[in-house]
């Protein structure tokens, strides 16, 4: 929903410490707009068959150059994972693993957090983990900003810490989605 995306974009901006624009809308809204209801199906279809194209579009929308800032081999490996993975466990793990790999490895430089968050949402919609894209995991991550940063820094040695935090974020995000639906 549009409300879910706006909440996510605002929380992402706060998580990254990004300044709000003069109109109060964070620059991250452009990246999140790739999942707006009018274009969501098209973005997710493209993500399923050409994920690097969608990652590039997210980065460009966030003000980046549209290519990984480092370790393009990891980006290629993630693309293969997205296009070849299947099964219930894969459906649950993909959004979390994708987010962790992009954010912890800073694949898109300063835009890595927003690219990771938007890509994780696209993955969750694609796999059916969050088929309508209503969950707002960003709010939880913003509330647990210090733990998130610590888990990102320790990802190489203890990836389970970040995975657990991200699963908790998705659980809390689903609860927030229920609240949005009830208020509508």
What is each PLM-predicted segment?
Residues 1-184:
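FIC/Doc superfamily catalytic core
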